[in-house]
From Swiss-Prot:
The lineage of its organism: Bacteria, Pseudomonadati, Campylobacterota, Epsilonproteobacteria, Campylobacterales. This is GTPase Obg. GO terms for biological process: ribosome biogenesis. Belongs to the TRAFAC class OBG-HflX-like GTPase superfamily. OBG GTPase family. GO terms for molecular function: GTP binding; GTPase activity; magnesium ion binding. Residues 1-158 form the Obg domain.
Length: 363
């Protein structure tokens, strides 16, 4: 099960209390104090592990607590420190103070380990309180309490390419034919109820991560449909691929404009990311002239049909691609507008190489 948020209380361990004891040895009358200190309470850490991609291990749990330190012992022996608690989270997890909404940590890198709460110090044993006036002190200190924090975890997926489109436009099919992801695929809206990640292999040595984000509808940025719950997952994507369904009752330009608007309303920064456009389901087109419809869409974007073919695009239908060999990459325009079919694999390999090249434009 994909869980992208969790709320619970975290407590570090309490320090163990000090010990009040006295030396008891043969021929030693009224031995001096030898009570040891209490052990330190366990710390709480966060550890980022890219072998997990969900917060499901925290589902239904309200409290996580590190172990308390053990009591000190005679013979000036310090009590055992409490075991630390390590909370394992996937990359992209934010740790948020549930009372103030302050983002405490943004955990991105695999292997990153953060000390979150330190355990309480152990109390001092009576050996520390001997003085000239009191040779046999019975006083010892209790351990200090651990720290308590009410937190919220929120997972925002990290991907190189995020698929943005209406429900049922072919995003799940596209990620299934380009990567190792196995999303549910069916002919109804909101098949994808949780984000899916897939690794796209480009040639023998290169790859990138693609995210299938649940479909966006009009008003998604206001919380309609699956709304803000899933729009947040494209916040961390480096590049956006707008997937436009040519077999949809909505026109291509209408789909594109709504998607761009919803992304911009959700995050102005996100709307400035590099992007490209895939015209999907050309195998299911039922209009009069797909070639003319694609040409008109390219014109409506104030672009011109391309003749250059660096990526060896199929040429049955028109396409657009920025010529970065003789001119600079223009972030305000799509890197390419490409008709594809996940069913027949039309332009699929070319799409993978073009996306990989687009990811390199920011390097």
């Amino acid at each position: 099960m994909f869980i992208d948020s969790a709320k619970f209380t975290v407590i570090s361990g309490k320090g163990g209390q000090g010990c009040a004891s006295f030396r008891r040895e043969k021929f030693v009358v009224q031995g001096g104090p030898d009570g040891g200190d209490g052990g330190k309470g366990g710390n709480v850490y966060f550890l980022v592990d890219n072998n997990t991609d969900t917060l499901s291990s925290y589902k239904g749990r309200k409290l996580f607590k590190a172990e308390n330190g053990k009591q000190g012992m005679g013979g000036n022996m310090t009590g055992k420190s409490g075991d630390s608690l390590v909370l394992v989270v996937p990359p992209g997890t934010q740790v948020i103070d549930d009372e103030t909404n302050e983002v405490l940590f943004d955990l991105l890198e695999n292997g990153e380990k953060i000390l979150f709460l330190e355990g309480g110090k152990g109390g001092l044993g009576n050996v520390h309180f001997k003085n000239s006036r009191n040779q046999r002190p019975t006083y010892f200190q209790p351990g200090l309490p651990g720290s308590t924090k009410n937190i919220r975890l929120e997972l925002k997926l990290i991907a190189d390419v995020g698929l943005v489109g209406y429900p049922n436009v072919g995003k799940s099919t596209l990620i299934s034919v380009t990567s190792n992801a196995t999303p549910e695929i069916a002919n109804y809206e909101f098949t994808t109820l949780t984000p899916k990640l897939g690794v796209v292999e480009v040639g023998n040595y290169n790859s990138f991560v693609m995210a299938d984000i649940p479909g966006i509808i009009d008003g998604a940025s206001d919380g309609k449909g699956l709304g803000l719950e899933f729009l947040k997952h494209i916040e961390r994507t480096k590049t956006l691929l707008f997937v436009i369904d040519v077999a949809n009752y909505r026109t291509m330009i209408d789909q594109y404009q709504v998607l761009k608007e919803e992304v911009a309303k959700f995050s102005n920064e996100l709307s400035k990311r590099n992007y490209a456009i895939a015209l999907s389901k050309i195998d299911g087109y039922y209009g009069e002239n797909l070639e003319e419809d694609i040409k008109n869409f390219i014109k409506e974007l104030d672009l011109e049909e391309s003749n250059s073919n660096e990526f060896k695009f199929e040429t049955e239908y028109p396409y657009f691609v920025q010529d970065t060999i003789y001119s600079r990459f223009d972030k305000s325009k799509p890197y390419f507008v490409l008709p594809i079919s996940s069913l027949t694999k039309y332009n699929i390999k070319q799409l993978e190489f073009a996306l990989y090249e687009l990811l390199g434009q920011d390097k």
